[in-house]
Regions:
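Conserved active-site loop/cleft motifs that coordinate metal ions or position small ligands
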Residues: 20-22, 163-166, 185-186
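C-terminal beta-strand-rich structural cap/linker in extracellular carbohydrate-active enzymes
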Residues: 196-226
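Catalytic cores of secreted or luminal carbohydrate-active enzymes
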Residues: 88-137
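Carbohydrate-binding surface patches
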Residues: 140-182, 212-216
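Short, glycine-/Ser/Thr-/acidic-enriched flexible segments
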Residues: 28, 169-171, 190
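Solvent-exposed beta-hairpin/edge-strand motifs
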Residues: 179-191
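Glycan-recognition surfaces
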Residues: 2-104
């Protein structure tokens, strides 16, 4: 059966050159080298509306290029602004895909989504062409009931920009840090305060069920000695 599915996908690519095709994750069954070469993107997981999807997406940086990792941002009317921020930042870990009931949400939520999409446009080249330099999900001991902090960092192809993601599940308020020697904070998105002192980038998370933040850092120019 699987061999026939592979033949079918290959036939589609041959018959329709340039086709942008998503390979369904099928519970992760298709996260293998054969299927990853057949489509333009592979859905990262079936955890579309689960908060634990952020941990799954981070861990998949070990085996997939994020430019091929389609991540659903499923936006629902019952979600709080905190949950919407969390969902949008989760999707920014890979190739963002909006879903849910966007026609039924409040103007506040639509504003968060629009701002998130605009922010993603400014970082997508790092997602597409960069290199992941930090994967940290060690605090998370259960995907079904995650608790703790997860981090991800990815640098641009030229090494001049650094993208830092942080997610917190049900922890007291705390500061989450990233090594950032020689970098300054250029922008951030999320429901968390962010800063960078030239040595560390920091984001304050926690104190609520879900919180998340993403920061874009840029390397400072060293002054040339006369």
């Amino acid at each position: 059966h699987v061999e026939e599915v592979v033949r079918f996908f290959r036939a589609l690519r041959e018959e329709v050159p340039g086709l942008v095709m998503e390979i369904c994750s099928s519970g992760g069954m298709r996260h293998d080298p054969v299927f990853l070469t057949l489509g333009s993107m592979v859905s990262f997981s079936d955890a579309h509306e689960n908060a634990d999807g952020a941990v799954v997406a981070i861990d998949l940086h070990r085996v997939m290029q994020p430019r091929t990792m389609q991540i659903w941002a499923s936006i629902l009317p019952e979600q709080s602004p905190d949950e919407v921020y969390f969902t949008m930042i989760k999707a920014m870990v890979g190739r963002i895909c909006l879903s849910g009931k966007l026609l039924s949400v409040s103007e506040e939520v639509l504003g968060i989504v629009r701002a998130g999409v605009e922010y993603y446009f400014g970082i997508r080249d790092i997602v597409r062409d960069g290199e992941t330099v930090l994967i940290d999900t060690d605090e998370i001991r259960s995907l079904r009931h995650p608790k703790g902090v997860a981090r991800l960092a990815r640098k641009s192809a030229d090494g001049r920009r650094l993208l830092c993601y942080a997610f917190a599940y049900g922890v007291p308020e705390r500061t989450v840090s990233f090594p950032a020697e020689g970098f300054v904070l250029r922008s951030s998105y999320g429901n968390a305060a962010a800063e960078c002192d030239g040595r560390e980038a920091k984001v304050v998370l926690g104190g609520k069920p879900l919180s998340a933040g993403v920061m874009l850092l840029e390397r400072t120019e060293k002054k040339k000695e006369k």
